[in-house]
A protein has these predicted regions:
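Basic, nucleic-acid-interacting segments
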Residues: 1-231
Length: 231
């Protein structure tokens, strides 16, 4: 970690203090994760400008979730306790290709220090936000070549949702509070999804005409977006 910090022009702390993060989902058999701050306030120079490296931490990995069913969760312990170098940047990247470039540069730095690399060993979380939008975290991105496309699609999604929001406001749209029971009405439906449901409820989306089917990103509609929240 000290070598990594130097390669990222960081200020190394005078003393390393081990902290405990409580873990309550069972992925750490001790009930907590050991972590500590190694360095702060670094930077990388990229073709798109300087990117600030806020912090470099050292922590231990958790167990890997295998399956959850019938109220029980199974974990694999093969990576439990493995040291992790956690690198955090500030929000100074403004182009999808810059995100990929920074990820590549970080990978090269880690490679030079013999840190284990490759799919499954390096996990990157992307925090994406735009003007008028919300910050969205996409966890566990592993493929460098997909990174710019992931950022592009999330920006596309947020821009589409902002446009829909403005249109709904212009229409004075609203979601009516009353919940309707459709079990009897749809008793003879041919829809397999509705047939398999224990019960069918509905609400009136006043002013949403024509927007539910609007695409917010390839393969995802506004209706899919609403369904994700409902689930």
């Amino acid at each position: 970690c000290i070598t990594i910090a130097c390669l990222m022009n960081m200020h190394i702390v005078d003393e390393f203090h081990t902290m405990r993060k409580q873990v309550i989902d069972g992925s750490n058999t001790g009930g907590f994760q050991r972590t500590g701050m190694v360095a702060t306030d670094g930077y990388l120079e990229t073709p798109y400008g300087k990117v600030v490296i806020e912090s470099l931490g050292l922590e231990e990995d958790a167990a890997r979730r295998v399956e959850t069913k019938d109220g029980f969760t199974e974990f694999r312990l093969d990576r439990l306790g493995i040291p992790l170098a956690e690198i955090t940047t500030d929000p100074s990247m403004h182009h999808p290709d810059q995100v990929r470039e920074v990820a590549y540069m970080l990978g090269q730095i880690l490679r030079s220090t013999n840190v284990k690399r490759g799919l499954g060993t390096i996990r990157q979380d992307l925090n994406i936000s735009i003007a008028e939008g919300a910050r969205v975290e996409i966890k566990g991105v592993q493929d460098l070549d997909l990174m710019a496309e992931i950022v592009n699609r999330e920006v596309q999604r947020q821009l589409a949702l902002i446009d829909i929001k403005k249109e709904l406001n212009a229409r004075n749209a609203e979601v009516l509070d009353e919940i309707h029971d459709l079990d009897e009405l749809l008793e003879d439906t041919e829809s397999k999804i509705l047939k398999s449901a224990e019960t069918i409820k509905a609400v009136v989306l006043k002013g949403y005409d024509g927007l539910i089917d609007r695409e917010v990103q390839p393969g995802r509609r506004f209706g899919t977006e609403i369904a994700s929240y409902a689930k």
